[in-house]
Regions:
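Catalytic cores of enzyme domains
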Residues: 47, 84-246
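Non-catalytic, usually N-terminal nucleic-acid engagement modules in DNA/RNA processing proteins
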Residues: 1-91
Length: 246
């Protein structure tokens, strides 16, 4: 079995150990070159504060991107409730800290083979004062070919956009050229749909802009009511026709 297949199997097995098939589906994994020019372009698209892989791990050769898709039950709930979703909040609260377990298993596997590796924390990689994040898991996943961005700023994979992304950097050479993915977002494709704009409870998301501060304020409000302590909303994902793909 190739190193890439071993890493993919390791990630799948670790997530399966959660034993929560009611919340999570089988992860999907892909790889990108740490020196892909699109990482440098993120300094223009996102901002100069966004770090390149080699600024996080100097000898990085590859970025491992993976997505843990939520189940249909989890994805469907946020659009049906006021405030935060119980199922979405639980899935979020469980998987975010568990990414540390998955990442450490991957790092240990690579270390045993003589490669350096490090992970970027799954969430809250931004300064709450300015909402500037030093790393975008979704953008890394897009570069790795896992999906394309929709109008709601979420990455739509072959399993949809409802779920969570994470990244591991390594000195191992794992990447291969990925064919450009075709967008699944109906609004991006032909201007139809737009349900994500209509459902946003605070109008943070509109066709030509997204206000991160207003969105985060709504998530913080929901956090006060969430028994899992999750600062989430998920409505713009839940309402999307391609949020869940079987």
């Amino acid at each position: 079995m190739s190193m890439k297949n071993q890493i993919e199997q390791l990630i799948v097995e670790k997530v399966a150990l959660l034993n929560r098939p009611d919340l999570f589906r089988k992860p999907i994994v892909s790889f990108s070159s740490a020196t892909d020019s699109r990482y440098s372009e993120l300094k223009e698209i996102i901002g100069p504060w966004h770090l390149n892989p080699t600024e996080l791990l100097p000898d990085a050769q590859s970025v491992i991107s993976y997505f843990v898709p939520f189940t249909s039950l989890v994805v469907a709930e946020p659009k049906t409730v006021d405030g935060g979703s119980e199922a979405w909040g639980e899935a979020y609260a469980i998987i975010n800290p568990y990414f540390n377990v998955v990442n450490q298993a991957v790092i240990q596997y690579l270390s045993d083979l003589g490669y350096s590796a490090s992970a970027v924390q799954a969430t809250h990689t931004y300064d709450p004062k300015d909402m500037k994040s030093m790393w975008s898991h979704r953008s890394a996943a897009a570069i790795a070919g896992l999906g394309t961005f929709g109008a709601n700023r979420m990455l739509i994979t072959e399993k949809g956009s409802g779920g969570r992304f994470c990244s591991v950097l390594t000195s191992a050479t794992l990447y291969e050229e990925q064919a450009p993915a075709e967008t699944r977002c109906l609004y991006v494709k032909n201007g139809s749909c737009g349900l994500c704009f209509k459902i946003c409870p605070v109008n943070a998301l509109v066709p030509d802009s997204f206000d991160k501060f207003i969105c985060q304020d709504e998530c913080n409000k929901n956090q006060k009511q969430d028994r899992h302590g999750a600062d989430t909303c998920g409505k713009c994902i839940s309402v999307c026709p391609v949020a869940y793909i079987d």
